Amino acid sequence: MDAFSDILSGVKLIGAVFFAAEFSAPWGFTMPSSCVMTARLAPGASHVVLYHLLIEGRSVVEMLSGEQIGLEPGDIVVFPHGDAHHMSSGKGASLPFPNYGISDKVKSRDLSPLHAGGGGEIARFVCGYMTCDPHLCGPILNGLPAVFKVNIRTDRAGHWLENSILHLVEEAASGRVGSAAMLAKLSEALFIDTLRRYVSGLSAEQTGWLAGTRDPVVGKGLALLHSRAAHPWTNADLAEEVGISRSALVERFTRYLDEAPMTYLTRWRLQLAARALQKTSRGVADIAAEIGYESEAAFNRAFKREFGQPPGRYRAEHKSLLTNRRNKADD
């Protein structure tokens, strides 16, 4: 399995479409940051990635920094770090935007399209989100900008995803049994497909973890480290399996990931340990051995360096945090 798939398969992604609209120009609204949206959409989540998929018409996304991104039909715009932003018809739309009752629609989970605006050109779109653990998704999230867009209408797979999501949004709005669960799975597929399209569009000069997965040397090295994380790797062993000199391997990893292979392996092992501490009741010594540590004490020291606290406290605080979030969600 490649490293990209390995991370995504090991992280519990939960997706949903939370809003559908048919606005007429001029129109505009402000989407708060994920800190605010998490409480509204997924109170038990530790991180929310937001996205908008434009179905018809034109739109402009403006970040609080002033950066503007024009959207065409089929464009999906993603906010990996949950940055606040404005979305509007562009020309003729100005702050402060009217109150269209979006918050009420989101709160009620009503997916029937909201109709609003000034009577001009029509824009149809849906808004969705993905939840994930930022520690376990770190390699992917850290390699993404504050905002990016791709167009999913460039092939049949993208058309199928778009049409399927629109069909299920209509079904969910009418209350058909099972439509919400199917929509959640499709939202996850759309997110992964969008990431793949983003990676395939990176320039040859681009660095970072995502770009590294495309490089024949770094990509193969990452796949080996992920598939055999507990193996007692050395730079020389990994270089031999990849088919390159040790010095060239280290240089290539450092160029793309800004760290040497064994440094990356250590962090990946500790992320696997964090996942096990969160999701299982296995003992710390067993987890340490499973990821390649012969000494529990050495594992404890490494874990504290990475996460700022020993494994036992990390597990206890994670459980407490989940309990508090669930209690708030029930209030």
PLM regions with names:
Residues 1-69, 75, 86-114:
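Generic protein-terminus/edge-of-domain signal
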Residues 1-30, 124, 138-156, 324-330:
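A short, N-terminal "cap"/entry segment at the start of jelly-roll beta-barrel domains
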Residues 54, 225-228, 277:
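Short helix-to-turn junction characteristic of helix-turn-helix DNA-binding domains
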Residues 72-73, 80:
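Residue-level recognition of short, solvent-exposed, well-ordered loop/turn junctions
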Residues 109-136:
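Alpha-helix-centered segments that form part of catalytic cores
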Residues 126-223:
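An amphipathic alpha-helical interaction segment
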Residues 189, 193-199, 220, 224-271, ...:
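Basic/polar phosphate-binding segments, predominantly the helix-turn-helix DNA-binding elements
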